[in-house]
Each structure stands twice: as C-alpha cells, then as structure tokens.
Amino acid sequence: MKMNHHYGELKASYLFVDIAHKVAAYQEAHPEKEIIRLGIGDVTQPLAKCVVTAMQDAAAEMGTKEGFHGYGPEQGYPFLKQAIQGYYASRNTKLDEDEIFISDGAKSDLANVLGLFDVDNTVLVPDPVYPTYVDDNVTDGRKIVYSRTNQENGFLGMPDDSVKADIIYICSPNTPTGAAYTREQLKEWVAYAKKNNAVILYDAAYECFITDEHLARSIFEIEGARECAIEICSFSKIAGFTGTRCGYTIVPKELEREGMNLNKLWLRRQTTKFNGVPYIVQRAAAAVFTESGMAEIQQNLDYYRKNAKVIADALDECGVWYCGGKNSPYIWLRCPGNMKSWEFFDWLLENCGVVGTPGVGFGECGEGYFRLTAFGDAEKTKAAAERIKTAIKAL
C-alpha cells in the first residue's frame, strides 16, 4: 500500500518540549523558587454558572424518555444556530441560519475545510504563524508562501500584488502576536482575494477580546467578504470551552468557485464525515448568548483583559516595544537588549522565574520576539510583571 508521505515532511515541533525541559531543570536546581507561567494558551477561569446549569439540565433531560436526544443534525441544532445569529445581529452582521455550522472546535474546522479545495492551490500564511495553518497544508501537499510580518508593519501583513495565493489565512486578533486588523486593512484583503479569485479563511477565535470600535470582529463586516471568505470561530476563548469543545464555521451562500457553491459543499461534507456536537454541549453553548451568560463571560474576559493591562503597563514603564495586549490576551514583545528569543527565555527564567514562549517558535520572523499571555492567575500575573519590570530596568 502507499502512505501519505507528506506527513513525513512535517517539521518536528520541539518548542513546548524544550520549554518543559528547561523549566524542569531550573525547578530542580532551584526548588525554593516559585515559577510563574505566562506562556499558557489555555483559559484558567471556570465555566459560567449559567453554562454549567444548562449542561446539567440537558444531561437530566437526556435521562428521560421525553427529553432523550440521539443523533442530532450534523450542522447543529437550530436553537444554537439561532443564538449565534442573534450574537452577530447585535453587531449589525446578518447571517442566515443555514450559513452557520456547529463543530467541535475551530482547530478541527480549520483542517477539515481544506477538503473543499484541491491540493494544487497556493496557500498564504503569516509569519509568525499559528503552526496548525502550516501543518494542515503540509500534510495535504499544498504549496505554502509566507506573508512576512515585522515590527515596522505592526506584525500585520498586507496584500502583495506580486504574490498569487488561492487560500489566505487571516487571524485577527492574531495568535501569537495579538495584533488586530482595522476594517480599512481588511478591505484591502477582501479586494485582494476577489482580484485573485481566492478564499480567505478567517480565524475569529479571539474576536471576543476586541473593545476598539475601529477593529472588525467579523470578516463579514466588510463589504464583499461574503463572496470570498469563510469565518471560523470558537467557544474556547469567549466562554472557556477548551475542555468542553464547541465552535462554528460560517459559509456564506454567495461563496462560489468553479461553479460550485461552498455552502452546499460544506453541508455535504459535514453530513458525510461528521456526526455533530453532543446535545448537552450545544445547550451549554447556547446559554453563553443569554443575557446572564453574556454578563458572566464578560467577567471572565475582563479578568484576562486586566491581566493583559498589568503586563502591558510594566512593559510601557520599561520602554519595551510590544503589540497586542489591548484587544487580545497575547502580548508580543521585542526582546530587550537585542536578545534572541531563546536567550531571553533563559534570561527571564533565571532572573525572574517567569516562563513565556520564544517568538522564533512561531516562525523565522518571530526571532528576537517573545509571547506572554494573560490567561494566568491575576495575583501571579502582577507578581510576574513586577519581577520583569525590575529585571529589565537593571539591564
């Protein structure tokens, strides 16, 4: 038999393994010192009470003959799709119910949606990049080109007419950099996609952190995007569903390529290869969009926003350049003293007992930069910020 040898082309990822080894060695050498981890990309606040109640009620419902649910609609229950419709409508973005597809998370859909496109397509991804974008396409054998970002452009790549791409990845606010596109910038990307007959895969997993009214929370706020974009979103960051698993993808009915309607194709794909998200989880997700749900999740989001501000304020006081932190849980900073990413990791661990993520782990353009996150404990984040501030000032 023949195997998919493209899996052999995946680059070994030692980033988090190396971090774990370095932290373990430091802890063994300094058992008396407290290590504060600001590299975590997972949420830490518990699910909202109304979400837990909805889950409990749905579980109890499943234990009755009248309330039992077996196989559900592969594209999601109407009650959740309508709740998402309302969420977008509150921001003046109109969606049809049959354009919303419920999934077990953004990561799955980011990979699965590629099945709609031939492998003989060129993919444009940013550098630095969320590694999944690259790996999903390497394993399919697609050609990948990079939009190289830097401090000068605020780590927000813009269209280059000399580059032809068929599939365009945009994540805003971005992981790992925390940078977010304005509506005017997204208009340029939509124009580029339409000019090149390309499709934008818009990762909106962090839209809930946006507070700046000049920033778009959905690509569909941009005129013309319904003809060239698919939006993928998640309950992981807005509601802490990293362990509960639920997300959704929006495929507009206007989106067509080579005479094929992508909304219909995605429906066929899901009904063929996916059995849907559990009823209990979808009831929990729908509770997020209730009045009490939105109030509760805002408390958690504000908790993380305050952590981000604590870190950003410390960097401001030290005169360290960074992006993110204001509409994102990620703070992407220039390593002080012209240190390389791993050099700064070692320095930060040794001098502050603080752990973050070396920027070079996300791509060549991340060298010399470093990621801190706001998902930690508030008191520990304050302590880490003070340690960092003191150490950098002493450089």
Locate each region found by the language model.
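PLP-dependent enzyme catalytic core of the Aspartate aminotransferase-like
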Residues: 86, 94, 124, 338, ...
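Conserved glycine-rich beta-strand-loop-beta hairpin in the small C-terminal domain of fold type I
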Residues: 282, 286, 301-312, 322-335, ...
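Conserved core of the PLP fold type I
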Residues: 66-193, 207-222
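Hydrophobic residues in well-ordered beta-strands that form the structural core
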Residues: 125, 146, 202, 356-358
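Helix C-cap/helix->beta junction micro-motif
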Residues: 30, 140, 195-196, 318, ...
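N-terminal small-domain helix-loop-helix segment of the aminotransferase-like
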Residues: 2-104, 112, 288-291, 395
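Conserved core segment of the aminotransferase class I/II
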Residues: 222-302, 309, 313, 393
